[in-house]
């Protein structure tokens, strides 16, 4: 059984009776009649209605596939994009900010850098006693004190607002805080409580007037005790108020150790002895802090920042710090009590590594149900029954499990070695938490009844004050209305989208007209596609004003107002029902029915089609004639000149229906400026003769005006003027060729570029190497290039430029001497230095370049009496040591250790050359954003190849191979540097790229180590393209480069703190301002 053929299963079969458009046009042109069948063929009406194409086919007016996506399909934009994308275009949905319930706390907006204030405000609000105290304030007091008023309004919104977060801007603005500057949350709390304490003192409500002192104020005394008499100092009995206890954490692991450190006894001895009033002398003594009373809420401020005197900046201590869920403070009091048990109620967290930046969040316990919440500005997250969230996979009620201290640190274990007070860790039920970012801890006293059982004494009167009810209700009503309006707008828009989609599907379902239907209408594909794909149907533009949506068929009309067959790929064939649906709703047009085919356009198309066939056939028949003409085989009869390159390109072009622009001008390249035939030996005037038939075809299809085409029969004579000019040029070139030939023969060895063997006692002359290189290229240029290269600069001018005006000495040095196999030569160069030539060559140069023989720069090879004599001679050029071999050594031994050097007349001007080289060096070291290569070397020393590349002297304006910038296995890097880049900055780049800390880098250029971090690369003579190598000493530990960079970026400024805000205003100034607000 044979398998079915599926190779062409996706191709639609062509109807057997379908003719090609070319055949139809030929029939129309020959008969002059247009039949109904011709219309079907030319307008592709015969094509079947298709289904399931991958895209919309331009070749079929009956194809409506791809105008809309498949079922359940979507597009990136327009009517058929995802529903959520359509809704997003309506703007933000206010309902996303809806608060779940008043049982869920609300957040506060961050105005830029106000997270420090937000976290403190949330801690204060979640304290039920403090909140009730603020809510109990009299309205008259609120009017007199703007800060209290804004705080009460903020608390009221946090209490009853339907929004998930509250705008803190009015409160921040009232305090005159700079919302763009990050501040310290501890300092803010201290100053804010002080400000509140002064403002609340005007209230007549007892619970509100002293709420700050009642909740947060405790007392301590600084006790100094004489070691001799055992008496306390008089000042020891004085008590000082505190609102928080500042605890050291550096080198300490937990809260118990920090409290021990805070209450530890200090010995006063030696130079710090205390003068005892009782003993009347300086004696040894002890000093300590004693807790006299504790408030219901104790704030522990953890000193996470230490001052660095070297950089005058603060650095954060990021070590883990442990603290318990319950804390017994009774034993800490000067009069011990067992009823002072505190529970953890809030944790203020500072995220970030820098002291002057980062982010504050607060973890606060809800006193009503024991749930913990994270307050991160606008975002509020439920943490569960533990301050850092439930441990995944663990039940919170298992007493043998300790909760996680944070998401990144394990809970602290009860290790006696790490505990200062065993009593604090005896219970296996006790919860311990650990954090690397905890900045402040709030503990609230646990109230107990007479039987020692914890009691919840939270007041049930937690309702909103009556003077805020109307305001909050109005805000909530406005917000709910905004949410409802958005939902209504969304519903209307989605209903419209659904309606539009149903409309498009309905029309497109009815749109296809079968080939047999005689009644149909044409519509622009572009308009139909936009109508089917856009949310709003396309609209024409009239005088710049968009009018009602309407059908636009003007792009598919011809100049006669009908439908041309040439536009069939830009239009679709609609059924009568689909057209009437669109036209009745959108109007427009013009209406183009099945009878609106254009007879005039069809006749023109038939004529053009026949002309194209004729052109194509004629060109095909003449190709063999053109090929024979290029081969020189022409038939008898008249011949004409055409450009040979042009005819070659004409043959290479594809056979098209009409002549192209490239077919014009077959004789343009042969026509001179005088309108005559160019001589054949002129540049670009190569020609070939073609028969008359081919010429007439090229003439007719050139596309040029008749007057612009110049015909050259084969007996045409070349232009006399151009011939004469070319003869003159040829004569000049012949003379130049003879002169160059003579010079090449006269200076045969010099022309070849071979090194000249130098001998002591002979006279030589010096010529600039650059001039000699130009002269060699000039005389060796032949053929077409014989006159293309310019003549070198006058030799006399060149020689004169080598003499300095100040000292009349040479401004360049002779090239270095090289001695190989007993022969002395000069190092080869085409750009730098002076090359020595023989006396005979100089005599010939004098004659050829009209230079006086006496102006020559003389030189000779001499031997020094000793190596010291050679070094002391200013005009001496030393021999290259690396080129010495055994023969040279034998020669040197025969000469008694003397070395050859070049003696010049005039002498070399070392002063001017040194000044010029210094300027060039300075200019070269003044570079910007250039590449250097750094290799990482593992081992004791760098490989020889790297050392030599690193020590190589850079060549001016050298081109560096791209391959030299490739890295191999991460062992080399290419860095962009400038001459002003410091060694320190370069080491930071290497640190970032190769991971070697700055202190461990042993950086070298060649064998010289690069030191002094403050020196620039220009100071160290490091040039563009240089190769350096670095080795890791591994002496210092690795650390993060971010620490180094952040320290460098910190600009030391005087800390302003809260200067200029109400938090630092005096009480009198605050009172005056309060009165002015009330006015």
Curated annotation (Swiss-Prot):
Its EC number is 3.4.19.12. Residues 961-1037 form the Ubiquitin-like domain. Keywords: Hydrolase, Nucleus, Protease, Repeat, Thiol protease, Ubl conjugation pathway. The keyword Repeat applies. InterPro entries: DUSP-like_sf (IPR035927), Papain-like_cys_pep_sf (IPR038765), Pept_C19_DUSP (IPR006615), Peptidase_C19 (IPR050164), Peptidase_C19_UCH (IPR001394), Ubiquitin-like_dom (IPR000626), Ubiquitin-like_domsf (IPR029071), Ubl_USP48 (IPR044743). One of its GO terms (biological process) is proteolysis. The active site is at 115 (nucleophile), 359 (proton acceptor). Residues 495-598, 613-715, 738-862 form the DUSP domain. Gene3D superfamilies: Cysteine proteinases, DUSP-like, Phosphatidylinositol 3-kinase Catalytic Subunit, Chain A, domain 1. Residues 1-12 have a biased composition (Basic residues). Pfam families: DUSP, UCH. PANTHER family: UBIQUITIN CARBOXYL-TERMINAL HYDROLASE (PTHR24006), UBIQUITIN CARBOXYL-TERMINAL HYDROLASE 48 (PTHR24006:SF722). This is Ubiquitin carboxyl-terminal hydrolase 26.
């Amino acid at each position: 059984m044979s398998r079915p053929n599926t190779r062409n299963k996706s191709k639609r079969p062509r109807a057997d009776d379908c003719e090609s458009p070319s055949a139809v046009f030929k029939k129309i042109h020959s008969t002059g009649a247009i039949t109904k069948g011709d219309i079907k063929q030319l307008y592709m009406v015969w094509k079947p209605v298709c289904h399931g194409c991958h895209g919309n086919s331009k070749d079929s007016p009956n194809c409506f596939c791809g105008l809309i996506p498949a079922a359940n399909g979507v597009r990136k934009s327009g009517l058929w994009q995802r529903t959520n994308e359509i809704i997003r275009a309506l703007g933000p949905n206010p309902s996303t900010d809806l608060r779940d319930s008043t049982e869920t706390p609300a957040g506060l907006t961050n105005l830029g850098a106000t997270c420090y204030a937000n976290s403190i405000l949330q801690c204060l609000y979640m304290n039920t006693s403090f909140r009730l105290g603020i809510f109990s304030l009299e309205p008259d007091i609120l009017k007199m004190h703007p800060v209290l008023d804004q705080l009460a309004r903020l608390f009221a919104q946090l209490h009853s607002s339907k929004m998930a977060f509250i705008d803190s801007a009015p409160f921040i603005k009232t305090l005159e805080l700079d919302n763009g500057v990050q501040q310290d949350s501890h300092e803010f709390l201290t100053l804010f409580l002080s400000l509140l304490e002064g403002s609340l003192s005007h209230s007549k409500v007892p619970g509100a007037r002293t709420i700050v002192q009642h909740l947060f104020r405790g007392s301590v005394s600084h006790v100094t005790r004489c070691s001799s008499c055992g008496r306390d100092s008089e000042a020891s009995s004085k008590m000082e108020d505190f609102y928080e206890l500042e605890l050291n954490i550096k080198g300490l692991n937990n809260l118990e150790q920090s409290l021990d450190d805070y209450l530890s006894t200090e010995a006063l001895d030696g130079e710090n002895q205390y003068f005892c009033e009782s003993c009347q002398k300086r004696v040894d003594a002890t000093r300590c802090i004693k807790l006299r009373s504790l408030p219901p809420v104790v704030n522990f401020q953890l000193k996470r920042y230490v001052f660095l005197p070297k950089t005058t900046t603060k650095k954060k201590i990021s070590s883990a710090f442990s603290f318990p869920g319950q804390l017994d403070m009774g034993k800490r009091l000067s009069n011990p009590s067992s009823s002072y048990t505190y529970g953890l109620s809030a944790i203020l967290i500072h995220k970030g590594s820098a002291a002057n930046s980062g982010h504050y969040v607060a973890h606060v316990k809800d006193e009503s149900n024991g749930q913990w919440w994270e307050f991160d500005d606008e975002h509020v997250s439920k943490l569960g029954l533990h301050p850092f969230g439930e441990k995944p996979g663990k039940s919170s009620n298992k007493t043998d499990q300790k909760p996680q201290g944070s998401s990144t640190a394990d809970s602290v274990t009860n290790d006696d070695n790490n505990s200062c007070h065993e009593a604090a860790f005896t219970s296996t039920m006790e919860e311990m938490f650990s954090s690397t970012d905890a900045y402040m801890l709030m503990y609230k006293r646990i109230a107990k009844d007479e039987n020692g059982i914890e009691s919840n004494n939270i007041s049930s009167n937690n309702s909103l004050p009556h003077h805020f009810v109307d305001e909050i209700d109005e805000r909530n009503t406005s917000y709910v209305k905004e949410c409802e309006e958005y939902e209504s707008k969304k519903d209307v828009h989605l209903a419209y989208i659904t309606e539009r989609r149903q409309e498009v599907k309905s029309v497109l379902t009815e749109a296809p007209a079968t080939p047999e239907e005689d009644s149909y209408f044409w519509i622009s594909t572009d308009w139909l596609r936009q109508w089917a794909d856009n949310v709003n149907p396309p609209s024409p533009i009239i005088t710049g004003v968009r009018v009602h949506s309407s059908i636009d068929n003007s792009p598919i009309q011809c100049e006669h107002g009908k439908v041309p067959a040439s536009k069939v790929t830009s239009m679709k064939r609609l059924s009568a029902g689909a057209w009437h649906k669109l036209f009745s709703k959108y109007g427009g047009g013009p209406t183009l029915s099945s009878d609106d085919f254009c007879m005039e356009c069809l006749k023109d198309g038939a004529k053009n089609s026949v002309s194209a066939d004729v052109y194509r056939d004629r060109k095909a028949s003449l190709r063999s004639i053109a090929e024979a003409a290029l081969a020189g085989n022409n038939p008898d009869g008249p011949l004409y000149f055409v450009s040979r390159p042009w005819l070659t390109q004409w043959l290479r072009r594809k056979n098209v229906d009409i002549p192209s622009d490239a077919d014009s001008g077959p004789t343009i390249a042969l026509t001179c400026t005088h309108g005559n035939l160019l001589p054949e030996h002129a540049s670009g005037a190569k020609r070939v003769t073609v028969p008359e038939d081919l010429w007439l075809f090229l003439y007719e299809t050139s596309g040029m005006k008749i007057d612009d085409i110049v015909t050259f029969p084969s007996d045409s004579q070349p232009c006399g003027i151009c011939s004469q000019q070319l003869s003159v040029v040829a004569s000049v070139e012949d003379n130049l060729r003879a002169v160059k030939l003579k010079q090449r023969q006269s200076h045969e060895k010099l022309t070849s570029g071979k090194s000249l063997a130098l001998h002591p006692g002979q006279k030589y002359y010096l010529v600039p190497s650059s001039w000699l290189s130009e002269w060699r290229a000039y005389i060796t240029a032949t053929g077409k290039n014989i006159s293309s290269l310019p003549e070198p600069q006058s030799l006399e001018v060149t020689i004169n430029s080598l003499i300095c005006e100040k000292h009349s000495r040479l401004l360049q040095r002779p090239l270095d001497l090289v001695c190989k196999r007993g022969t002395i030569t000069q190092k080869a160069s085409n750009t730098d230095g002076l090359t020595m030539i023989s006396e005979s060559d100089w005599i010939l140069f004098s004659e050829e370049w009209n230079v006086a023989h006496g102006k020559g720069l003389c030189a000779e090879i001499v031997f020094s009496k000793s190596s010291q004599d050679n070094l002391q001679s200013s005009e001496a050029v030393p021999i290259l040591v690396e080129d010495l071999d055994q023969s040279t050594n034998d020669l040197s031994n025969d000469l008694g250790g003397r070395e050859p050097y070049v003696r010049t007349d005039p002498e070399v001007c070392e002063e001017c050359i040194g000044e010029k080289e210094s300027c060039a060096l300075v200019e070269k070291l003044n570079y910007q954003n250039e590449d250097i290569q750094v290799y990482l070397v593992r081992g004791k020393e760098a490989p020889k190849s790297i050392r030599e590349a690193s020590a190589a002297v850079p060549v001016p304006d050298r081109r560096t191979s791209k391959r030299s910038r490739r890295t191999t296995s991460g062992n080399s890097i290419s860095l962009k540097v400038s001459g002003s880049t410091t060694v320190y900055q370069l080491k930071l780049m290497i640190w970032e790229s190769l991971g070697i800390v700055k202190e461990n880098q042993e950086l070298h250029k060649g064998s010289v180590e690069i030191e002094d971090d403050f020196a620039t690369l220009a100071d160290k003579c490091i040039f563009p393209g240089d190769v350096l190598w670095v080795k890791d000493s591994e002496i210092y530990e690795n650390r993060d480069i971010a620490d180094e960079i952040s320290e460098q970026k910190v600009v030391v400024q005087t800390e302003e703190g809260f200067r200029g805000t109400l938090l630092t205003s005096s009480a009198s100034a605050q009172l005056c301002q309060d009165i002015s607000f009330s006015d």
